[in-house]
């Protein structure tokens, strides 16, 4: 398996999620009190500096290190798009004549920044591994979401370990992504970002799962959620990983 195969699988999973209207379930899980309690260490009485206007901010102490938790609210997950992006300019998606066209080599190539031959080869590898099949009713490619989640939870951080770099402008990822309702970052403001000239934040450069990820997520809101959560799993410890897996599971329509 190659990293572009993982990108393709999550893109196709995002198409399934859009068909099944799963965005609300993912947002509900990310906003749940259970998740908030899992993420919340012992609170200390300290007024944090910084933060954006209108953003709830609290500082906690965990293992001797300050951690800043941000809570962001999205009132209209399906209809309102302000605030979910981590970049400064919108990127138009290619127009499609029908829903099934989104699964075509042409559409997947345009949305992911891969050539048609790369998409075809990637799909062949995914079919061989059992991660991609054909839907019985529609005949369209269908992701084995449960197995993809297992691989993401237990294997991706070892197959594709995180490579961090210098401070750069970029697109927030992990729990720092604005597509999520909460984020964790150090008190010094060092958040993980995918390097990108249009990024809205400065943070520590994190090499994306595949080089075209920063452009691909600008065209697909749910894909941004998915890949930010994948990075939270790759970057985080057992607790953060558990939270991210729970949100991702809900967003993929799994029980």
Q: What is the meaning of each model-derived region?
A:
Residues 80-91, 104, 134-166:
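Short, cationic-aromatic polyanion-contact patches
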Residues 12-18, 87-100:
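Short, amphipathic alpha-helical "recognition" segments used to contact nucleic acids or chromatin
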Residues 22-29, 34-35, 49, 104-112:
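Short alpha-helical "recognition helix" segments of helix-turn-helix
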Residues 179-255:
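Mid-protein regulatory/catalytic core that forms ligand/cofactor-binding pockets
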Residues 143-188, 204-206:
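Short, amphipathic alpha-helical interaction segments positioned at domain boundaries
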Residues 114, 124-139:
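A short, conserved structural fragment
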